[in-house]
């Protein structure tokens, strides 16, 4: 299935139903009083995280999603039905953004987590609500309010512990294949990897971490060169970044310069992302021998002013790969992910007597029924009363 990590959709919550103006009419009860019911609340629109999904492709074709409108109130004090809610299923890791204001509404980072993205309109009040000792036959009501409407940008951000950085053909996909059961495409030409992929690296019987591979960056990626930097967002939730460097590039480019290019593009994209813990890993040491690789790696580290440790591996042959994965696992266990307490339940619907209805009671809509005769009276000119008889 095609990997789609962005989609723009329109969500429309349902309008609230209008209140009803009605009076009770029954045999032998000539002055029954008001019995108009309230309208129903409009339906809400929710997003829910589903671990069985891994792409937003469904939302590329159907763009509009509308919840049900609340029904109008009816006579006999009947309240209108609430509008039907709709729930849209998205992959775990999806972020919802209001496309007009760029407000981040929330992140769905756990399976089953539910989020309200468009609130339904409030119900209108029927004339029964306006009955009082001085207003015994009220003809006032209120209308329901419109539901919330939004242009919603959905962004899928992969949830991984480790993120891979590097130029095209640095060996990132080969490394993923070496440490996990994932099988991303590997070839000897640039941009073999076109979409992000995940792999689960197992260290021993009961220890594992998730590693994310993204398409390689090139100089000018922040300005749109190559595949740009659109996939860097998938690294935002990683705990550590692995900067994989070809120690002896086939194009004879300078590895130190290549490292500077990646660091520059990363900083231009996000200063926060560039401050994440980053490990320097020199790959393809099997092409030049370990002793020469040691000397060359030390020289490169001095050129770029690298102060921390670095690793030398060969993803193709597996040389030193186990030591690297073991150290990554130890680092991840020593630095657990900071998880804020997140409510997996959606916001509850407010009680119907909220501030809106308190204000609406002050400015009701008056029904103008010039010919409406709510009760029979002896003062009527004809003095006629209808009597129902069974035939």
Curated annotation (Swiss-Prot):
Entry EC number(s): 3.6.5.-
| InterPro entries listed in its UniProt record | G_OBG, GTP-bd, GTP-bd_Obg/CgtA, GTP1-OBG_CS, GTP1_OBG_dom, GTP1_OBG_dom_sf, OBG_GTPase, P-loop_NTPase
Please tell me whether the keyword Nucleus is annotated for this protein: no
Chief place where the protein resides = cytoplasm
Q: Name one GO cellular component term.
A: cytoplasm
Gene Ontology biological process terms from the UniProt entry: ribosome biogenesis
Chain sites annotated for binding Mg(2+):
173, 193
Cellular compartment(s): Cytoplasm
Cofactors: Mg(2+)
Q: Does the keyword 4Fe-4S apply?
A: no
OBG-type G domain: which residues? 160-333
Residues at which GTP binds: 166-173, 191-195, 213-216, 283-286, 314-316
Top-level EC class: hydrolase
A GO molecular-function annotation = magnesium ion binding
Task: Outline the extent of the Obg domain.
Answer: 1-159
- Keywords in UniProt for this one? Cytoplasm, GTP-binding, Hydrolase, Magnesium, Metal-binding, Nucleotide-binding
Q: What does this protein do?
A: An essential GTPase which binds GTP, GDP and possibly (p)ppGpp with moderate affinity, with high nucleotide exchange rates and a fairly low GTP hydrolysis rate. Plays a role in control of the cell cycle, stress response, ribosome biogenesis and in those bacteria that undergo differentiation, in morphogenesis control.
Q: What PANTHER family does the database record attribute to this sequence?
A: DEVELOPMENTALLY REGULATED GTP-BINDING PROTEIN-RELATED, MITOCHONDRIAL RIBOSOME-ASSOCIATED GTPASE 2
- Describe the subunit structure: Monomer.
The family line of this record is: Belongs to the TRAFAC class OBG-HflX-like GTPase superfamily. OBG GTPase family.
This chain's protein is named: GTPase Obg
Q: Which organism is it from?
A: Actinobacillus pleuropneumoniae serotype 5b (strain L20)
Its organism's taxonomic lineage begins at:
Bacteria, Pseudomonadati, Pseudomonadota, Gammaproteobacteria, Pasteurellales
């Amino acid at each position: 299935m095609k990997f789609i990590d962005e989609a723009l959709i329109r969500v429309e919550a349902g309008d609230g139903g209008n209140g009803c103006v009605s009076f009770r009419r029954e045999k032998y009860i000539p002055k029954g009083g008001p019995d108009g019911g309230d309208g129903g609340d409009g339906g809400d629109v929710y997003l829910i995280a589903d671990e069985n999904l891994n792409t937003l492709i469904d939302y590329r074709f159907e763009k509009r999603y509308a919840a049900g409108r609340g029904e109008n109130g009816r006579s006999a004090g009947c309240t209108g039905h609430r509008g039907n809610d709709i729930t849209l299923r998205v992959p775990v890791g999806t972020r919802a953004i209001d496309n007009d204001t760029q407000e981040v509404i929330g992140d769905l980072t756990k399976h089953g987590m539910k989020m309200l993205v468009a609130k339904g309109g409030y119900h209108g009040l029927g004339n029964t609500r306006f009955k009082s000792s001085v207003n015994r036959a009220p003809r006032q009501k209120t209308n329901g309010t419109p539901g919330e409407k939004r242009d919603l940008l959905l962004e899928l951000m992969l949830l991984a512990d480790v993120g891979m950085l590097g130029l095209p053909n640095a060996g990132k996909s080969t490394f993923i294949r070496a440490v996990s059961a994932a099988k991303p495409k590997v070839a000897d030409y640039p941009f073999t990897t076109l979409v992000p992929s995940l792999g689960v690296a197992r260290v021993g019987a009961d220890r594992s971490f998730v590693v994310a591979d993204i398409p390689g960056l090139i100089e000018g990626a922040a300005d749109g060169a190559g595949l740009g930097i659109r996939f860097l967002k998938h690294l935002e939730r990683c705990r550590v970044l692995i900067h994989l460097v070809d120690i002896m590039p086939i194009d004879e480019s300078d590895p130190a310069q290549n490292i500077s290019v990646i660091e520059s593009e990363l900083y231009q994209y996000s200063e926060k992302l560039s401050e994440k813990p980053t490990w320097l890993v020199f790959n393809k040491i099997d092409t030049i021998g370990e002793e020469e690789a040691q000397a060359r790696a030390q020289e490169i580290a001095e050129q770029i002013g690298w102060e921390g440790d670095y690793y030398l591996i060969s993803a193709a042959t597996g040389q030193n790969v186990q030591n690297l994965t073991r150290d990554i696992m130890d680092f991840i266990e020593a630095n657990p992910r900071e998880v804020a307490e997140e409510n997996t339940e959606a916001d509850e619907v407010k009680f119907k007597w909220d501030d809106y209805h308190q204000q609406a009671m002050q400015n009701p809509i008056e029904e103008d029924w010039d010919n409406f005769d709510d009760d029979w009276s002896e003062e009527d000119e004809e003095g006629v009363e209808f009597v129902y008889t069974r035939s």
